[in-house]
A protein has these predicted regions:
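Charged, terminal alpha-helix-loop-beta segments
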Residues: 1-221
Length: 221
């Protein structure tokens, strides 16, 4: 939570946003974007290739002209890739908290700062009442793509498992595994866990019968 401390942000939401994304941004650029894109529920509008991350900023202060804000507009995370820009608006939990006017204000304020030189994508993390993509008409139509904290963690876990399953692990891959473990720990600290089913855990001897596992799963449908 380096960035939340630097910006004097002391809410649970700000600490979670800072801790998760500042560690995720340590991943190689293509892995970071791959995780974030795949975590989104309806990601067909998001490019597969992003290119290099040129810059990023937590809680930038943008010009509020033509918005409903009076002093500034402050998205949570702003990332400039080679090919496009991304606004990330994050909410602490999955209880409804995202709302149209905030999205619209951030898109207008982005246009005030950067014009329309690059394509803009908007990702709403957490706080979504529905999973399907919405559209905001502000300067131009922008799709609001959605995900949850858990859907991001699931992709982090999958990627880590893929690396650990390699027959030979390079030094770079080893450091990536350590970073993915750290990111998972950050999620856990903030109350987000990826539950692993019993039949996915590698053990030498079965601890529970297959019938019992199927019975347990029925309680979590």
């Amino acid at each position: 939570m380096i960035h939340s401390s630097y910006h004097h942000k002391d809410t649970y939401e700000d600490s979670k946003t800072s801790s998760v994304f500042e560690t995720m941004l340590m991943l190689p650029d293509e892995l970071f974007w791959g995780v974030l894109r795949t975590a989104c529920f309806d990601n067909e509008n998001l490019p597969v290739v992003a290119g290099r991350i040129e810059d990023y900023e937590f809680w930038p202060h943008w010009d509020p002209t033509h918005t409903t804000n009076s002093t500034l507009v402050e998205p949570d995370v702003f990332i400039r890739f080679q090919s496009f820009d991304v606004i990330i608006e994050a909410k602490y939990s999955d209880r409804p908290g995202q709302y149209y006017q905030q999205w619209k204000n951030e898109i207008i304020a982005y246009s005030n700062e950067y014009g329309s030189d690059k394509p803009l994508y908007f990702i709403a993390v957490g706080g979504n009442a529905e999973k399907m993509t919405e559209s905001v008409s502000a300067i131009k139509d922008i799709a609001i793509t959605k995900c949850t904290w858990l859907s991001i963690l699931i992709q982090i876990t999958k990627l880590r498992n893929e690396y650990e399953g390699l027959s030979t692990i390079s030094n770079n891959q080893s450091s990536t595994i350590r970073l993915l473990n750290l990111i998972e720990l950050v999620f856990n600290i903030h109350g987000v866990y990826n539950i692993r089913w019993f039949d996915e855990i590698r053990i030498s001897k079965p601890l529970i019968s297959p019938d019992s596992m199927m019975t347990l799963k029925t309680f979590f449908k």
